[in-house]
Curated annotation (Swiss-Prot):
Source species: Chaetomium globosum (strain ATCC 6205 / CBS 148.51 / DSM 1962 / NBRC 6347 / NRRL 1970) (Soil fungus)
Organismal lineage: Eukaryota, Fungi, Dikarya, Ascomycota, Pezizomycotina
Name of the featured protein: Mitochondrial distribution and morphology protein 34
GO BP, sorted A to Z: mitochondrial genome maintenance; mitochondrion-endoplasmic reticulum membrane tethering; phospholipid transport
Highest taxon above the source species: Eukaryota
GO molecular function per UniProt: lipid binding
Residue ranges with Acidic residues bias: 378-391
Amino acid sequence: MAFNFNWSPLTADAGFYKRARDLLTTALNKSPKPPIIVDDIIVTEFNLGSVPPDLEILEIGDLAEDRFRGIFKMCYSGDAFLTLKTRVQANPLNTCLSAKPDFTSPQPLAAASSLTIPLQITLSEFKLSAFIILVFSKQKGLTIVFRNDPLESLKVSSTFDSIQFVRDYLQRTIEGKLRDLFMDELPAIIHRLSLQLWCPDQIAKEDEEPKEADEHGVNPLATPPLDAVDLHGHLLDPAAISELSLDGGPEAQLLFSQKTLLRLSDITNSQVTSSLDTSETKDVLFRAWAGPDKVDLTNTTPLATPSLARSYSYTSPHTYTFSDNGSQDQGSLPSRPSLVHLNSATAGLSLGSGRHSKAGRKKKTRVVNLRRKAETEANSEEEEDTPETDSIEPPMSEPIMPHPILEESDEELASNKVHFGRSPDLQQQPRRPSFRAQATNAPEVPVPSVELGKTAVPPLQSSEKQAARFPSQDPAFVDSKTGRPRPRSDTSSVILEQAWIMKMAGEIARRVYDEKNGNPTFWDDQDDTPPPAYEAR
């Protein structure tokens, strides 16, 4: 099968060359240019030459009167040439610094000044060899696809041919640029040129559509808003709006719609979102609202931590408190810890929270004289200071006020110093002496009492056991403080109190007496001699 391939009509048409130069100029300036080229690349001359390419048919896929599809092998080594014109940067230091960040450059002054030189490049002696897929249609034009890189070699002639390294640099750069041009841009250029030859009506449509798209613009002054306001929110006169123009100055930029401004303000006052229907969240501070003029809420002083108090709870219905009456008379709080919440006679002691009060105060030594005084002195003090409390019966829920313990003066303590040596007076005393009489400067507060009913008579056996265990509960018991018989109308709480006090006092005296008998010399004041290792020499 033979084909007649006429090359002369392409080389003789002047309009074809003009159209080809424009397409090549657009294609060369589309991709990023190297930093050395500082101006646009313009195609000044383009000629296909008189030698046509050699085509070899490898495969025919479709053949008809108006279409053709096949695979060809093309070889070209003709006299076609292409001339380009541009401007280049002759100072390599300026080119290097322009392609790097400012903070990494040494910032030279005169050495980095720009020096641009016009450059003219001529491309000739093209040698091409490629496999081409060619598709032709009268309605769609000619489409060519290169299956491999078609460029084998070419000759680059420029203004700097006398400078060897510039010529080599231009040769490498232009060859790489043309390889990309053949693979990407040349098929599109050939397709558009084929449309100009066989389908001129489609060329006119493609040229008109972009122009129409560019011409149609939006004029904001053609249809101004009905409630037009300026930047300050003042209404504008419609006659004044018609006099405005897009190029008239800043007045055209101050034309706003009042509704638009209201909606924009709603967006600003909402949750900083584009949705006007966002539900409002109370007591929330957004980061976008906090500017440099806002108060920094992160440095505010946190709220003071509430003071914590430890409380002790017991199930005992009675409370016994021993306080320092001498300190109360002086108008100060007692430094001795108080005894609170006694559960029963067999329960342990619980100290109050007064151990940290008056920490800087000097500690006083309390000495309790356990020896019994004369009954006459105790009786007179009891008759003068103790009120009658037998007839008063307060409710059980009433709290018991503390029973103060008198504090002896320093002179009395010096005269009545307790010695635990063996003496005839101490041998005549019983093993468990009773607690000393309680003398008070203030009247005693009545204690809760329970009236024993006439019908509520305890059984005989339990009363005998109780009398044997606590002799103080016997009706004929004589009080150690007053010497008078204690009536049966005393409450059980008073009996338990006296029993517990007697038990504790006797236990303390017994332990002291046992320690004294076990080690008689322990309580004597004597100076021990130091051990031999620490004797003075």
